[in-house]
Amino acid sequence: LTPALERTLGVERSRPAGPRLRGRGGVTSYFGRRKNPFGPGVEFHDGLDFSAPYGAPVYATGAGVVVQAGWMGVYGLAVVVDHARGYRTLYGHLSRLAVRPGQRVARGGLLGYVGSTGRSTGPHLHYGVYRYGTPVDPRAYLDPTWYTR
């Protein structure tokens, strides 16, 4: 392969492609302003929440390096993967972790298991995409059949 093609393939392998969850029940909360599930008013939600059974495996949506794995406040047990080129993904509310910081993961690599840790109303995966540190709507990186209402 040519060096240019190798770089292009590397970009595609590292670009987030959206979560794949067994037994998923669809999106329960979208990116953007939403009703606060814990009280009155509205709040900004910085990702997508996917309904899934407790203990379902959670996989990396792109190749990268785990930069955080542990307790992350409102996200509970969570994993952050750096995909380079300004992309990071966050996987929150996990019940158990399967990775540690510094570990390289491939797209589809096991990160942990669905839970309800942190600020959570029940078992689900909070999936966030960040571009240069700013949260962006993950739907831009998903097949529409994964989030259509």
Where are these regions (language model features)?
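Non-catalytic extracellular/periplasmic "stalk"
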Residues: 1-26, 30
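Catalytic cores of peptidoglycan-degrading enzymes
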Residues: 19-149
